Amino acid sequence: MSGELNGNDTSVQAAVSAGSVLEGAAFADEGEQHNESMKTLVLGALGVVYGDIGTSPIYAFREALHAAATNGILARSDILGVVSFIFWALTLVVTVKYVLFVLRADNNGEGGILSLMALVRGALKGRPDLILGVGICGAALFFGDAVITPAISVLSAMEGLEIVAPNLTPFVVPATVVILVTLFSVQKLGTGRVAIVFGPIMALWFVALGASGLWHIFDDPTVMAALNPYYAVRFLTVSPAVAFVTVGAVFLAMTGAEALYADLGHFGRKPIVRAWLWIVFPCLLLNYFGQAAFILSHGEAAALPFFQMIPSFALWPMVLLATAATVIASQAVITGAYSVARQAVQLNILPRLEIQHTSEKLHGQIYIPRVNLLLGLAVVILVLGFEKSSNLAAAYGIAVTGNMLVTTVLLYIVMTRIWNWRVSRALPIILGFLVIDMLFFSANIIKVHEGGWASIGIATVLVLIMWTWVRGTRHLFQKTRKAEVPLDLIVEQMAKRPPTIVPGTAVFLTGDPKSAPTALMHSLKHYKVLHENNVILTVVTASKPWVALADRARVSQYNERFMLVTLTFGYMQQPNIPRALGLCRRLGWKFDIMTTSFFLSRRSLKASVHSGMPLWQDKLFILLARTASDATEYFQIPTGRVVEIGTQVNI
């Protein structure tokens, strides 16, 4: 479905109608080609993809041990069980599920939950709303993750001050707020100039993780016995109730795994996989096993083991490096939130948002002021409300486990409908993933009262907003379509009663090229004039991320006065109507911006009891429509060439 471009409401009714064996399997059918060197891409992936999961050792092992302790006492079997569980969870969830399977499910090279949703909907007849609903839930959970990640990451790093200088403990929360406010304040300047150091800093961070862990493994080398899954299984079976609660905390070691897929379009599969197998996975394991060995030999150190196992002379540098790493992790999540928000707008899941480009060279570097403001406020409120990273842990797990569960469900459809796998082949794999996902999700969902309510609350509000927008735009489209007049009939009437012809070209934007655009009807009714050349323009968003320039425009001559033009953009592309119309020159229409006027409809919406939606949802939709960014700016049309015609619509 395509969309009419209006001033206050809908813009686009979107047409979404460890080692070589693993690596070899992951790269089967590999088709990516990169101009940059592999080393550069791997380094870049360290700075963007792995910031979140790379900072998990600061708090994940600590939280898991707290959950596993019985009356504050940890047995040796508990410590080995927890670290064994972390090892096998990272192996099965990240290395097997994401590296071997999910990264293959790209949508023309792009990843992320909305890309996966668009891919699945495009493969199913009728583009079922159930898949749209699943995608909306996944996107809402991602935004919930984007709120929690900066809060828990930076807060956990600043808690290192409690070890370095206990007298600075009261300043942990204020310092965290200052760092986060600064981070969100500088977003409008762009990250291009500083992003170049993200990779090297994160590389140094992973080296520090691995080195500190390796050093302390020698405190108790027997910790390596935890590589045996026996310890994980024994931990789960000896005390199931305690183990079940601990599973929720263990999942914190997996947070950030979804970034492997979300950032697929930025780096490609090969650099992401190589960074994981060669650097990230080994360094994470060394650190987790090092923390376990340190606690086995220093039982009293379970409070903040990550910082407590650092030598005193290296504490300050480690706190500073941890702070830098968590800021980078937060930056990656913020950038991801911008990207998902843009996709949601293009897929007509959210209203139009003002999108600013912060780099002339890199089109993907964008800044969305409204998303930045709401995200920043939510993050600061979480920090002030929860005060400690341990209090945020419960909220964190629900968002990420929910997102992973959605990914698994959509992956099954990709396997059976796109890869054409037999159900007998796909189902056992998916069931295995679902068992793991459900185990983690159920272990986290029981923590609603401990802070999980924050994650659920954020996701619920966002689902409500997105579904209201989808439902409202559909009702509006159907209602206005009933009142529209077929273009054939208007042309026939004009042939009988010709209006006054004025020079120039008029472009009328519409969601249905078979109907006369509202702006055209008002122009004929009130001014009784028709331009010499008239273009009925439809903008369509494809279910793939990128549309080649050769496929951007379709032009057909309706009659001597009217021309039909369809512009198609991918959901990762920012529509630029004047530039796209310039491509029509090679199709026979000599577009000249200086002699062209763009006619847009600006609708004033009013709630109605007959809309088909509850009155409260009508009012919410109207509020969302009023806050949508201006169509002229969104589609990058010169303001001096735009004529807006207002209409009132009861929905």
UniProtKB/Swiss-Prot annotation:
Transmembrane annotation, as ranges: 41-61, 82-102, 130-150, 163-183, 194-214, 235-255, 276-296, 309-329, 366-386, 395-415, 426-446, 450-470
Entry GO MF terms: potassium ion transmembrane transporter activity; symporter activity
Keyword line: Cell inner membrane, Cell membrane, Ion transport, Membrane, Potassium, Potassium transport, Symport, Transmembrane, Transmembrane helix, Transport
InterPro entries noted in UniProt: K+_transporter, K_trans_C, K_trans_N, Kup
Coiled coil regions in record: none
Cellular localisation: Cell inner membrane
A GO-annotated cellular component: plasma membrane
Ion transport is among the record's keywords: yes
Known catalytic reactions: K(+)(in) + H(+)(in) = K(+)(out) + H(+)(out)
Membrane topology type: Multi-pass membrane protein
PANTHER family given in the database record: LOW AFFINITY POTASSIUM TRANSPORT SYSTEM PROTEIN KUP (PTHR30540:SF79), OSMOTIC STRESS POTASSIUM TRANSPORTER (PTHR30540)
UniProt similarity note: Belongs to the HAK/KUP transporter (TC 2.A.72) family.
Main function: Transport of potassium into the cell. Likely operates as a K(+):H(+) symporter.
Name the record gives this protein: Probable potassium transport system protein Kup
Source organism: Brucella ovis (strain ATCC 25840 / 63/290 / NCTC 10512)
